[in-house]
């Protein structure tokens, strides 16, 4: 299966039969290069990706300043050090799951709930980890 198919079929899917979808999603390499993305995934800056990569290596580095994606600031919430970063911006947010070789990113807005985004992103991330990815 191509990385684009994972984005289209597993991240941008209908969430639990509700007719709701993530706003955008992507799969990136651990160096921040985009492997596949949805049509509306924001164009981030290299320094923003460096901050996210550093947060996975040193949990808590983004909490004081927030996390930025394409200039949009997300307040960093609890996550799982080295594995998951969660952020909130207004009525929406972001979830990023790190695997052995990639980062799975999902961005959502209402009516999608934070837990729904986390479930979609982390489920794919866990699957890829099980596959040695």
Curated annotation (Swiss-Prot):
Gene3D superfamilies assigned to the protein according to its UniProt record, in alphabetical order: Dynein light chain 2a, cytoplasmic (3.30.450.30)
Disulfide bonds: none
CDD domains linked: PROF
Top-rank taxon, per record: Eukaryota
Keyword set includes Cytoplasm: yes
Subcellular location: Cytoplasm, Cytoskeleton
One GO MF term: actin binding
GO CC terms, sorted: cytoplasm; cytoskeleton
Coiled coil: none
Keywords: Actin-binding, Allergen, Cytoplasm, Cytoskeleton
Family: Belongs to the profilin family.
Function: Binds to actin and affects the structure of the cytoskeleton. At high concentrations, profilin prevents the polymerization of actin, whereas it enhances it at low concentrations. By binding to PIP2, it inhibits the formation of IP3 and DG.
Subunit and interaction comment: Occurs in many kinds of cells as a complex with monomeric actin in a 1:1 ratio.
Record's protein name: Profilin
């Amino acid at each position: 299966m191509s990385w684009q198919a994972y984005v289209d079929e597993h991240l941008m899917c209908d969430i639990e039969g509700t007719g709701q979808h993530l706003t955008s999603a992507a799969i990136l390499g651990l160096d921040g290069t985009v492997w596949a993305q949805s049509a509306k995934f924001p164009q981030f800056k290299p320094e923003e990706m460096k901050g996210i990569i550093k947060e996975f290596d040193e949990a808590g580095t983004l909490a004081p300043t927030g996390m930025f994606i394409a200039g949009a600031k997300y307040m960093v919430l609890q996550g799982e050090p080295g594995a998951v970063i969660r952020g909130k911006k207004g009525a929406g947010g972001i979830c990023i799951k790190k695997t052995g070789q990639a980062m799975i990113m999902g961005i959502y807005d209402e009516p999608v709930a934070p837990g729904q985004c986390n479930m979609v992103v982390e489920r794919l991330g866990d699957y890829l980890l099980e596959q040695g990815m």
